[in-house]
Amino acid sequence: MIIRSILLAGSLLLASAIPGTLAKSDEPEIKVKELDKVPTSIYYFEDTDTIIFQKGLGEIYISTDAASSWEVMKDKTGLLWLNRHHTQSACIVGDKRKHWVTYDAAKTWREFEVPDKLILGERIQPFVFHGKDSNKAIINAEECLLTGCRRVTYYTVDGFKTIKKLLQDDSGCYWAVGHPNVGEGLDIRKKIDDRIFCILPGALPFNSSPRLVYSDKFFSDDMAIPVEINGRELRGINKFAFVKKFLVIATVSDGTSEAAIYVSRDAMHWDRAEFYGGPKVREGKFTFLESTNYSIQVNVASRRSKLPIGSLYTSDSTGTSFTMNVDSVNEDKDMYTDFEQVSGIQGIFLINRVDNAEEVKTGKASEKKIVSRISFDDGRTFKPLKYKDKEIHLHSITRPSNSGRTFSSPAPGLVMGVGNSGDRLKEYEHGNLYVSDDAGITWRKALDKAHKYEFGDQGSLLVAIFDEAGGDKIYTDEISYSLNHGKDWKKVKLPHTFLLLAEDKNKKFYVMSIDFSGLHERKCGKNDFERWAARLDEKGEPDCLMGHKQFYRRRKADADCFVKEKFKEPLPEIEPCKCTKEDFECAAGFKRNNDYDCEPDGKLKPSEGQCKKPDDKFMGPSGYRLIPGDDCIKKGGVDLEKEVERACKETSKGPISGKIAVEATPFETEGFQYRYLERSDTSSGDDETVIFKTDKGEIFVSKDHGKSWGRGKFKEPILEFMPHKYDKDVIYLLTGSKKAYWSIDRGHSFHAFEAKMPFTRTLGSLPLFFHPDRPDWLIWIGGEGCSGKKCNDVAYYSKNRGDEWELLLRGVNKCMFVGKEGELTNDDLIFCSQHEGEDPHKDMRLVSSDTMFSKKTSIHFDGKPIAGFTKMSEFIVVATKNGSELQSFTSVDGKTFAHAAFPPNFHVDFEHAYTVLDSSTHSVFLHVTEHAARGHEFGSILKSNSNGTSYVLSLNGANRNVKDYVDFEKIQVVEGVALGNVVFNTEEVKKKNEEKKFRSMITHNDASEWALLPPPKKDVDGHSFGCKVTDKGTNDCALHLHGYTERRDNRDSMSSGSAVGLIIGVGNVGSHLTARAESDTFMSRDAGITWHQIRKGRYQWEFGDQGSIIVIVAEGKPTKVLSYTLDEGETWTDFEFTDAEVTVEDISTVPSDTSKNFLLWTKKGSTTDLVVYNIDFSGLKERERQCVLKKDAPEADDYYLWSPKHPMQKDNCLFGHVSLYHRKKPDAKCYNGPRLDRLSSEKKNCECTRQDYECDYNYERQTDGSCALVKGLKPADPMQICKADPDAVEYFEPTGYRKLPVSTCEGGVQLDHIVARPCPNKKKEFEKKHPGISGLGLFLAIFFPLATAAAVGYWAFSKWDGKFGRIRLGESQPESIFSGDSPLIAIPVTIVAGTVAVITALPLLFSSLWRSVRGYTRLPGRWRQRPYASRGAFAARRGDYVGVVDDEDELLGAEEFEGDEEDEV
């Protein structure tokens, strides 16, 4: 009988003759194989004597006689890759495109080839095997082209005999049947056997949120079907995994670190998992553990502890309802968790927990006190491990000493581990070997000192080898073994003394096979076995789990025989039990409480016709159901599934009232501040949290949108609160001292921390700066040595939410984490503006570091002074001082800053300012102040190209206020639409100091062109306005709206991120904007194309339920009425919310505008106290049901597809497509519910035009719109792509143009590639890719178009009495059959013009032909290039013009980008 070979990596220490084999009959036989490299990937083919391992990354060794002899596999070198689902199958990945596969345990191998190089990364496997069909596999490869390497996925269904392409640019593909247990107990095999899930990038421009799609036909029909949950496409895919029969998806969304877990058992229907009783599941902070066929085990990491600690959850049989079992399980920094089930026995597992978890989490303990516990009832209870009268603690997964399982094997009930007795787990080197033969109930010490160990012959043989370091080295010359379950041990000398290390300077390594088959000649008989109960209760009787008792037939400990049943694992004997409470789990809509009972989770609803009165009772669900797969017998046992009588008061909601509900709460405060904690797509729960601060520094929290309030208990007043910029569940409260508070559970609880020093207000901003991707990383800027208003501001950083602080920099003005975005790839990168010499009176300079300024500091611009910096999207924008001017620089990688080229003769004085208007389309909007006199500020808005290096003028005279806010507002969701107010009397303002006069402007093509707002035809009463109204706004008659600079709360906006196309504003119709007191309220339903007046006078407004409810209330005067509309403003209804008039200071709702609740913040009469009204529209019958949206029939039910108009663009195209949005039909009586993906994937792409291109890097726009190389700059070597990618075949000569990254246009004008040339030494590949044209073909290609054009041109000339004139863009004339626009004339004219062009181009043509003979120049064909995604993608293709005639330059138009938020530099 053969046990597993023991791997010893070491050097031969005792010199002797060539080692021989021990020959004693009472000792095992040992054979040694010497190697010169460490053997890796040792694999045993099940049910065979074949063992295979890899030496380094090259040679592969194989043994077919259980390691007695070894040989090297000939002509097959590479990486060994095993098929874990099919134990006879494996692959060898060759170093090129040649690979091998076996299906018969390495007896035979078949060669196969993949067109591209396989991916061998830490996170990407080369093969993804089918769970049941060994012939099916997904193959992950990468294809390297001119623009870089891209992922390509292939598949095979016939054992690698044929390989076909599946997809490209995916982020991972998986078989639906990715585990042998998928579909267990369900008749779905035929439906999902060929189904493949793939993670793809976002389907829309700049939507990087990964989505999950599937196909049952290998995507051959180009149909990628999105996975949807309740009609919503699943996005933000973070992880895809198989846990036994369960398919599990983890998703994350912007604005929260919480992950949503979705589970399916049939690869067709998905449900979100709920976690009860512990911390929320966070992105990257959870691990799926070894699970059973009826539940999933998950470890969720704690967010607070600097020493890793987790919480262990166990699911019900659906995999969707998780209950926390252990709140302090031990884990390491890589999320490996000390958890392991005892092999083959249901319900028993060992864990290590942190006994001082609270002290560790709060920073009071510097190390973890780890103790071991065991559960015999599937995690309901845990008990200590007992050795005699002592507790023992064992090292587990986080400190592995064995390969494979840590404690157990298929040997029934045999468990071993290294540990110690006492009150806590000590270091491994201080441990002993312990063994249990009753599945962990009792333990005995097996051997002193730490040992590696292994099980053999179904547990009748235990083997151990010394594994404890003496100094830094482990010496051993013997092994130990036991034949009676570890009661007695014998030692066997090894041929030599070995040093157990991973590396050795002598480079000698050994594999030893140890054969114990000669120790017992007899094979075990019937009387040598016992019927062993796998689980015992407290009385020592066999215990039940999952409705049955489990027994094994195993060899008695003292039997002098071997089982000798090779390749056969023991199977349990099952004995059913009567049902008890433990055989039931919580039914859907219920959860476990602390007493392990099932209670409603808030979703319990009575049946139709029940609960007509609040005091009624009804027969409802018990909350329990029998666990699927449980074998218990209900007869004579417990049955918890029967319905029970329940009180109607238990129901989550009463009947729809048809009325609007109002709750009023008074507060003794004059001033107030409030913050909503917004919800993200993956946020769990349904709270609507508002946090409110009084002028006395008191904090009140409401979880139900202001219906009820709880007062926070803080020892000192709160001065400010700061919601986390990137995590919507987190908020910080700041006091006047070093003390501050945070909440990571949406205000449910608050925890105190101390900063190094109090924050100061000298910066004009709050002290905390957050990391975009690491929610617990903070920068705190406080003041030291403060004297009056003068402070030396110092920055500190923390990586654990303020538990510990380290010095970052002194003398700073601002510091911020950059995060990963675009080409910014370093998580640790920090930028700071620091005063020279740390002196607050001196100029600032820009510095950066990716080592927290502890080792390396980069000083940018040679230490020259800067005015400020900011980061927005993927750009870092800096304003430097250059004499009396400011200059702008931009970086996309945090290393190289490119000077931003402003339009000619556009200079910015030092005293003036930049305001950066944030962008979401890879460009920068910049407001440059041109006149800075207080109260008379205005400037110009510039727009950059996609790398922020070149600007064009977008809007002159844009209004700015003294706080540097700008009247510029991006209309949310709708692409390309923005509003702005301009000062039209700029000369009078500058020269005569007159008051500013404003006009409102709108753009529909992303600030390329602006127009006045068209006024409504009539006012709300049907009367005309006092000016001549036309379809377009004119200088004498247009609509003008008060903008961003006049708002009391800069969080207010004219539009909503969820109410598509709806805009509300306050203003007037006339020649210019008048005083706010004279304003009326206007609305647009089509993103600003048309407007109508909705109320006389000025009103405040809020959008609710994504625009299906809009509420307005009078501004600045007492009222007791609000008005609302349910049909996008077509009709309005007044509602009296109070008996006495109040003045509404503000109206608010959740920032996403998805709630049906609103808050009115009011003052009553002459009092200064505050009254907050909650207005709840949930009871309206018109909003009783949820709207239905079907993606395959988007206009069939409650929605329709709406496309915004872009009147200044041809065919409404913008960014290369016509956008389509899902909008609720105004008359649909339903509510939207969770936030919809408004932009439809059914967008229509347009042909490329000049608007889809911009100037390439090192090129700049000329006055005629063309692009030319910047004077003094040289293009980079376009052959760099060949150097960067050895597989590249060709490169393109630069044209000066590149496609906008945001554009999705197809075909049409192609300006970004003209001439292709072969890479060095790739002449043959280039010719194969671009076969040349024959001489005859060239003659025909030239002669026939010329002849045809001449004939048709002569006919047109003879039939048309007009004369050819000069063609200008934009001219229009009356149409006739012989007009220039008539097809009868336009086509011949085009042909004749083409003839003239061909004749003109003949010299260029012959020149080009000559060059093609010499240099293989290729004219553009049908090949299409991907849009540039980053600066690096186009940097390698710079250069001056080649083969581009001058007339083509005028095709390039203005760049198109968008921006929204503002940040002053």
UniProtKB/Swiss-Prot annotation:
Lumenal membrane side: 24-1336, 1405-1465
InterPro entries, A to Z: Sortilin_C, Sortilin_N, VPS10, VPS10-sortilin, WD40/YVTN_repeat-like_dom_sf
Intracellular or extracellular location(s): Golgi apparatus, trans-Golgi network membrane; Prevacuolar compartment membrane
Ranges of the Cytoplasmic topological domain: 1358-1383
Organism domain of life: Eukaryota
UniProt GO cellular component terms: cytosol; Golgi apparatus; membrane
Keyword set includes Signal: yes
One of the GO BP terms on file: Golgi to vacuole transport
Keywords: Glycoprotein, Golgi apparatus, Membrane, Protein transport, Receptor, Repeat, Signal, Transmembrane, Transmembrane helix, Transport
SUPFAM superfamilies: Oligoxyloglucan reducing end-specific cellobiohydrolase
BNR repeat extents: 374-383, 434-444, 481-491, 700-709, 1082-1092, 1124-1133
Signal peptide residue numbers: 1-23
Transmembrane parts of this sequence: 1337-1357, 1384-1404
Chain positions carrying an annotated carbohydrate: 293, 882, 947
Membrane topology value: Multi-pass membrane protein
Biological role stated in the UniProt entry: Functions as a sorting receptor in the Golgi compartment required for the intracellular sorting and delivery of soluble vacuolar proteins, like carboxypeptidase Y (CPY) and proteinase A. Executes multiple rounds of sorting by cycling between the late Golgi and a prevacuolar endosome-like compartment.
Family to which the UniProt record says this protein belongs: Belongs to the VPS10-related sortilin family.
Name under which the protein is recorded: Vacuolar protein sorting/targeting protein 10
